[in-house]
């Protein structure tokens, strides 16, 4: 079987290095490009050695100079916007794992997906996407409770994370609201806010240390509570999911796909 050729955008970052390390030992993949910011101090370094693995003879570059079968982006919104346009112009499938995109950037993603295959998900984790499926099921059952259900989402990430709440937390809320019908999304509480209305979802973001990601979704009823918690113990879960998504995207036609499509959920 011929390996799928991939490029990693954001290759010198924390996630990019794990993508390089894990992608380099996957017999179904071949890393042919590793791209980072043109101002990165790691330009020219071997991507494999930078990631702490074997030499790959693939230098960190400031631009995409080859034609891979798929690109994986783990960067920041403005850089993701640039690689999106490059993939669009070259007709290259894209796995978009960057979070924190604004509405205009999201609109560009939807438009580009009419021309190229894009796997776009706030989390590449298998268990996170399974938890989303469980939350949709729970919401469909619990919304019938006469006493009402209070939904709160608590997410924890490392101190370096720039967007809050996480894109994954917002996706959990979007899924639950789509099933249960909540209209208000409240971010934290402070002061005399009054009694809690049942038509809202509360979000609470915690930033500590090097936590790679944790989400707890609370369904509170009278007399009982259901909590669904998913925890990442390291970043490999996101990298492995993104690598699987690249294999998937390389075989698809134009369209906007999610990790649910990759996992068959």
Predicted regions and their residues:
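Short glycine-/small-residue-rich Rossmann-like dinucleotide-binding loops
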Residues: 75-76, 99, 207
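Rossmann-fold dehydrogenase core element
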Residues: 93, 108-125, 142, 146, ...
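C-terminal substrate-binding/catalytic lobe of Rossmann-fold NAD(P)-dependent oxidoreductases
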Residues: 5-65, 147-265
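Residue-level detector of alpha-helix initiation sites
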Residues: 13-14, 78, 125
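Rossmann-fold NAD(P)-binding glycine/threonine-rich loop
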Residues: 83-85, 89-90, 98-120, 129-137
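Rossmann-like NAD(P)H-binding beta-loop-alpha module
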Residues: 130-146, 164
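N-terminal Rossmann-like NAD(P) cofactor-binding module of classical short-chain dehydrogenase/reductase
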Residues: 71-72
């Amino acid at each position: 079987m011929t390996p799928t050729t991939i490029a990693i955008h954001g290759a010198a970052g924390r996630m990019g290095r794990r993508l390089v390390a894990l992608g380099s030992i996957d017999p179904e993949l071949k890393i042919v490009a590793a791209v980072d910011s043109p101002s990165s101090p790691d330009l020219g370094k071997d991507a494999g050695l930078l990631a702490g693995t074997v030499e790959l003879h693939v230098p960190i570059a400031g631009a995409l100079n080859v034609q891979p079968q798929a690109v994986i982006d783990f960067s920041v919104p403005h850089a993701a916007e640039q690689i999106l346009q490059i993939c669009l112009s070259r007709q290259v499938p894209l796995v978009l794992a960057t979070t924190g995109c604004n509405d205009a950037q999201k609109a560009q993603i939807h438009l580009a997906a009419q021309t190229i295959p894009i796997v776009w998900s706030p989390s590449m984790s298998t268990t996170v996407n399974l938890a989303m499926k469980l939350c949709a099921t729970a919401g469909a059952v619990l919304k019938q409770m006469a006493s009402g259900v209070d939904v709160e989402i608590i997410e924890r990430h490392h101190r370096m994370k720039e967007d809050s709440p996480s894109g994954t937390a917002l996706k959990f809320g979007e899924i639950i609201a789509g099933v249960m019908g909540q209209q208000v999304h409240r971010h934290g509480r402070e002061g005399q806010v009054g009694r809690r209305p049942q038509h809202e979802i509360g979000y609470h973001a915690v930033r500590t240390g090097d936590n790679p990601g944790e989400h707890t979704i609370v369904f509170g009823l009278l007399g009982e509570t259901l909590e669904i918690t998913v925890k990442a113990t390291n970043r490999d879960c996101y990298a492995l999911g993104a690598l699987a998504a690249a294999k998937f995207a390389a075989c698809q036609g134009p369209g906007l796909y999610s990790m649910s499509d990759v996992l068959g959920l």
